[in-house]
UniProtKB/Swiss-Prot annotation:
InterPro entries registered for this protein in UniProt: UCP007248 (IPR016511)
Name of the protein in its database record: Uncharacterized protein HP_0245
Domain of life: Bacteria
Organism: Helicobacter pylori (strain ATCC 700392 / 26695)
Family: To C.jejuni CJ1463.
Amino acid sequence: MINNNKAMLEQYNVSKLASEEKLKALAQNKNDKLLKEQTDSFEALLLKFMLDSAMKMDNPLYPKAPGDEIYASMYKDTLSKELSGNFGYSEMLFNFLKEQEKQKP
């Protein structure tokens, strides 16, 4: 009976440890996903700044119409979000931050 209880206790401890490791892995995956979303958002912001500079809408051939600035801003926002993740800034920043996290005591 004592051996049976020991075996049950050992099995419980092993399953508890495995559960804790699974929870840590899930938390790490969740943190990685959140970090990737943030680095993609940062890359989108950088691209928006570049697009704002590159796509100045001051063209004398076309008159200004009401709502042009709003439409152009929405277009640049959408374009920058679609382009983010493809230039490598996000991946580079993600990898840098992951290395910094590993070096933290």
